[in-house]
Amino acid sequence: MSWKKFITQQESMEYYNALQAFLKSQKELGKNIYPPEHLVFNAFNLTPLENIKVVILGQDPYHREGQSHGLSFSVPEGIKIPPSLRNIYKELSTSIEGYKIPESGNLAHWAKQGILLLNSVLTVEQADPGCHAKKGWETFTDNAISEINNARSGVIFLLWGSYAHKKGSLIDKNKHTVLTSTHPSPLSAYRGFLGCKHFSQVNDILAERREQLIIW
């Protein structure tokens, strides 16, 4: 199944209609919702189901103007790199030989190499993190994870922090690889994320399979 077919399937479900009604009501109230509507499904558009090598699961989008473009942990060109992404870059610099920390926080080049940068909740209101939780997006993205689990094999899931760890129950660990650590947030990065070597492990696994390595 393609992501287009998957999304069409979800659109016919009751939970999705309720979710869209909620989003419509918020827009009618004049709320600023991020990311912009055309980027809500950016992760799915940039990383087709059949191309997925890695899934990096986030929680919900950045909630400040201009930050969110539909990819977990990523920000568009010209936007200040957020603290969690700074720690991701820090970990990359210690685990990937020759890695130079970029000036941009745009991870679209990861997405185009088969890394699905998926938030569990796909929209947020300006300056109100988590406000679109439990409105239906979790069902949508859980169903997407289940689709990956069923349709593919050998996908590497990077689950950072307790929220992401719970999604591990949707993944068949006999078919896929699950790597876990604490969240890269400054609050928890030093309790296990920094030093986790997930990025080098991903390339080691891909090398063993004689697959194209990720250019981080």
Curated annotation (Swiss-Prot):
The gene is ung. One of its GO terms (biological process) is base-excision repair, AP site formation via deaminated base removal. The keyword DNA damage applies. Belongs to the uracil-DNA glycosylase (UDG) superfamily. UNG family. HAMAP family: UDG. GO terms for cellular component: cytoplasm. Keywords: Cytoplasm, DNA damage, DNA repair, Hydrolase. This is Uracil-DNA glycosylase. It comes from Psychromonas ingrahamii (strain DSM 17664 / CCUG 51855 / 37). GO terms for molecular function: uracil DNA N-glycosylase activity. SMART domains: UDG, UreE_C.
